Amino acid sequence: MMAFHYIFIALEVVLLFNLLIGVHELGHFLAAKWRGLKIDRFAIWFGKPIWKTKIGGVEYALGWIPAGGYVALPQMATMEAIEGKSDTPAEKLPPVSPLDKIIVAVAGPLFSFLLAVSFAFVVWGVGKPTTEGDNTTQIGWVDPTGPAWTAGLRPGDTILAIDGYPVKHFAPTSQDSVTWRIITSEGPKIAIKYRRDGQEKMAYATPYYHPTHWYERRSLRQILVAPAEPSIVDEVFSNSPAAEAGLTNGDIITAMNGQKIFSPFTIMSAVDEMSNGPVKPLTFTVQRGSDHFDRTVLARKPLEPTNSPPSLGIVAWLLDTNVSLVHPTPYEQVQSSLSQVFGTLGAVFSPKTDVGVQQLGGAVMIARVYYNLFQSPDGWRQVLWFSVLLNVNLALLNMLPLPVLDGGHILLSLIEVIRRRPVSARLL
């Protein structure tokens, strides 16, 4: 049954991804028909057609490679390499005015933007899931070997600003998030304004980069912290130390060895340290309903496999707790997406940040994100929200003045207006 579940999710990803590309290409197609351009082919998917038919001089085809689609427009020769080779030589057709070329090129991004707005209205109605960890800037865990700890940050501190920019949450869904501001920070030190015990303080952290192989893209800046969220036991192995101590599903651990904890990562880190040191008992303060009590758990190594590290027997922590639905307006969603796209482009082209073109994700990364979202609780709502951001990205990035993008076609058409003759195909 699990295999069918994964296959179904994969099919959802393929269909949704192709919907986004198909709508974009539909914009080009309808604009070309409106402006009277010759259309050889409107194809969904690539490769040799497994089905095709001709209606009104246009061949409609379905390829066998499920990765988008294209419109073959012989009068827009610069599109052939990207959107399919035409069967009709361009020189046998009447020329197309620069205005018509611009309209056809703009129509694709316009349809992507309209699809983003459509998704935004749906999200406004059904809501977007958000968790306690998404909506806080309080630190739940700090890696004791990381830059944040060295700079003086501790669990329970609340981050107020990064490099002078106020932050409102941890999740990198907008420019006012802790994660986003760390990733796009500039300079050798990251200035972090935080509050502890009612007092505002400053910390200066040296960014950390996760080691990568030569063939991998360079990792982005981190300070190795996690947001605060309740430590709720999701599942306990039977006959494990945790089970023998009386811990059960749904228990909330509020303190460890007398110290308040703000994240289950604190417990996991304490257990990990026992792999290279002595195994010490951990005393947890547990909240179960309205009751509060202490339980002491001594981790031990599982019998199988023999080289396993010590374990408490807690299979999983319920990280996505206190999930609620927010209903951002379409304007708020589109404005946030536009801001994030422009912010990303600014970071990519800035010589002062570590964000480069290599960090931008392609089709594989997009498919992976969709796959993970579909697997998450309320995944379909998350997918709708992400589709707003993705379509705004698709619309704006395609308007960049690069030859392989719609913006490149617009630029060439503007050059044609200035020169009063088309750009030579030998230059493209």
What is each stretch, according to the model?
Residues 74-83, 91, 96, 139-210, ...:
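Juxtamembrane extramembrane loops of integral membrane proteins
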Residues 88-99, 218-255, 259-394, 411-428:
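Functional transmembrane alpha-helices
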Residues 5, 9-13, 96-105, 109-112, ...:
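Residue-level signature of transmembrane alpha-helical entry/exit and packing/kink sites
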Residues 69-146, 198:
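Internal alpha-helical transmembrane segments
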Residues 123-161, 165-168, 218-255, 259-262:
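PDZ/PDZ-like domain segments forming the peptide/carboxylate-binding groove
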Residues 5-87, 397-419:
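Small-residue-rich helix-interface/hinge motifs
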